[in-house]
């Protein structure tokens, strides 16, 4: 006979488990499904929604976390300085995200949702991209040129997001070089004032 002392201890599911499981689903190119996630965690959908919000909020949080991690990794490996290095950081971020197959597939499979999450100025992903762009500029521009106003950062981020994700959603290649050129033109015009 088995006693309770011999039974394995089962870890109770948490919000962090939900986020990890959903991220694995996303990175494997699977559709993040709330019912599948709740079932896998052994919790009800009400509990899952209380932990992570709705599906859009969950995916936005996952992509915001990925954005933050990617900018940190790129910054950790940066070797140059100045405006060229700042834009190289932005370029690497755009190239890596545009080339991330699960993200591209998501954008093409669910275009309206992807655009809300990736391009909307109010999205948590855009907040993380703005922070990453601001950090790249802060780390590479002389102190005399800082801080860069928030509206200039917003223009850089919105132009970049629009020229990156709108083409991907319709099955075209992103225009990263144009986005970088336009962004640099805006920044240099600001710095020349």
Model regions and ranges:
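Basic, helix-initiating cap at the start of DNA-binding domains
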Residues: 1-40, 56-57, 65
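Solvent-exposed, amphipathic alpha-helical segments
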Residues: 21-28, 69-77, 159-167
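Amphipathic alpha-helical segments used for helix-helix packing
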Residues: 97-120
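Amphipathic alpha-helical packing segments from all-alpha helical-bundle domains
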Residues: 114-144, 150-157
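Charge-biased, low-complexity intrinsically disordered regions
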Residues: 47-48, 82-83, 162
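Short hydrophobic/aromatic patch on the recognition helix
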Residues: 42-52
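Hydrophobic/aromatic-rich alpha-helical bundle segments in the mid-to-C-terminal region
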Residues: 140-185
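Hydrophobic alpha-helical connector segments
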Residues: 61, 74-102, 153-156
